[in-house]
Amino acid sequence: MPTGDFDSKPSWADQVEEEGEDDKCVTSELLKGIPLATGDTSPEPELLPGAPLPPPKEVINGNIKTVTEYKIDEDGKKFKIVRTFRIETRKASKAVARRKNWKKFGNSEFDPPGPNVATTTVSDDVSMTFITSKEDLNCQEEEDPMNKLKGQKIVSCRICKGDHWTTRCPYKDTLGPMQKELAEQLGLSTGEKEKLPGELEPVQATQNKTGKYVPPSLRDGASRRGESMQPNRRADDNATIRVTNLSEDTRETDLQELFRPFGSISRIYLAKDKTTGQSKGFAFISFHRREDAARAIAGVSGFGYDHLILNVEWAKPSTN
């Protein structure tokens, strides 16, 4: 196999290794052996040593923008930077468009259009949701019913009025006999009712002890005269008003809130359907005083309630 010395042209990779491991720049020496697109092997005139740096160039072709810049690194080597951008058209509100046309000031007075990473931080869009007052009330923490009972006395001692049982009172042996003796001296009742002259002795205690049946005529209170409710009923009839033209969704609580400002109410009767439970359209309101009922008629009659005009008048007295 013949051997001999021959001159070989160094490859492009060897030249890159000899020049150094700096991959940021492309010098004119490296471009000598690289064929250009036009077939010319001469380097770009902008990268020749001693030539001034040309200004940046922008070329827009449709929606593609190409920006070409020339810079010099720390070693004095020239290099070219080519950046390609895709232009997108986005719709924005008029207020946002006007803010983009504002002139920059301060440290960003000479910055190009767009945000500067040194002074501006671009983050994700945050959407703000406003809640109503009802939702705000629902978000409030519900009060614990046990916290209300903390300040109340559940157990009260009959001797010292402390918050413990009477059987566990530490002053039971000292204050108990003293209170009993004082009550006897003052003639206070100790729980047993004194018998009045001519009054029959109640048989209720005997019934509890023996368990025998006691007829109603011999029970406690049998000698007292019964009270008639007829006068009270007549008073209710005199202070009762009749409300008509009510909606089907009306409830007794609605009538209570509507007529409560005029005076004290004794009873409310709302006529309802037996099957559906809805209002039949009329109701009766009884006040304790006739003056309050008169003011309710003057104030509510002709009043618009639940998209209906109410009619209020005096109720006819019952014939029973």
UniProtKB/Swiss-Prot annotation:
Its quaternary organisation is: Component of the eukaryotic translation initiation factor 3 (eIF-3) complex, which is composed of 13 subunits: EIF3A, EIF3B, EIF3C, EIF3D, EIF3E, EIF3F, EIF3G, EIF3H, EIF3I, EIF3J, EIF3K, EIF3L and EIF3M. The eIF-3 complex appears to include 3 stable modules: module A is composed of EIF3A, EIF3B, EIF3G and EIF3I; module B is composed of EIF3F, EIF3H, and EIF3M; and module C is composed of EIF3C, EIF3D, EIF3E, EIF3K and EIF3L. EIF3C of module C binds EIF3B of module A and EIF3H of module B, thereby linking the three modules. EIF3J is a labile subunit that binds to the eIF-3 complex via EIF3B.
Q: Where are the transmembrane segments?
A: none
- Provide the RRM domain boundaries: 239-317
Note down the stretches annotated as region Disordered.
1-59, 209-234
Sites where Phosphothreonine occurs are at: T38, T41
What's this protein's family per the entry? Belongs to the eIF-3 subunit G family.
Q: How is it modified after translation?
A: Phosphorylated. Phosphorylation is enhanced upon serum stimulation.
Keywords noted in UniProt: Cytoplasm, Initiation factor, Nucleus, Phosphoprotein, Protein biosynthesis, RNA-binding
Name listed for the protein in its UniProt record: Eukaryotic translation initiation factor 3 subunit G
Record's function text: RNA-binding component of the eukaryotic translation initiation factor 3 (eIF-3) complex, which is required for several steps in the initiation of protein synthesis. The eIF-3 complex associates with the 40S ribosome and facilitates the recruitment of eIF-1, eIF-1A, eIF-2:GTP:methionyl-tRNAi and eIF-5 to form the 43S pre-initiation complex (43S PIC). The eIF-3 complex stimulates mRNA recruitment to the 43S PIC and scanning of the mRNA for AUG recognition. (Microbial infection) In case of FCV infection, plays a role in the ribosomal termination-reinitiation event leading to the translation of VP2.
Basic and acidic residues: compositionally biased ranges: 221-234
Q: Name one GO biological process term.
A: translational initiation
Carries keyword Phosphoprotein? yes
A Pfam family annotated for this chain is RRM_1
The record ties this protein, via PROSITE patterns, to: RRM
Q: Where in the cell is it found?
A: Cytoplasm; Nucleus; Cytoplasm, Perinuclear region
Query: Which residues get modified to Phosphoserine?
Result: S8, S11, S42, S189, S223, S264
Q: Which GO MF terms does the UniProt record name? A: RNA binding; translation initiation factor activity
Gene name? EIF3G
Q: HAMAP family from the xrefs?
A: eIF3g
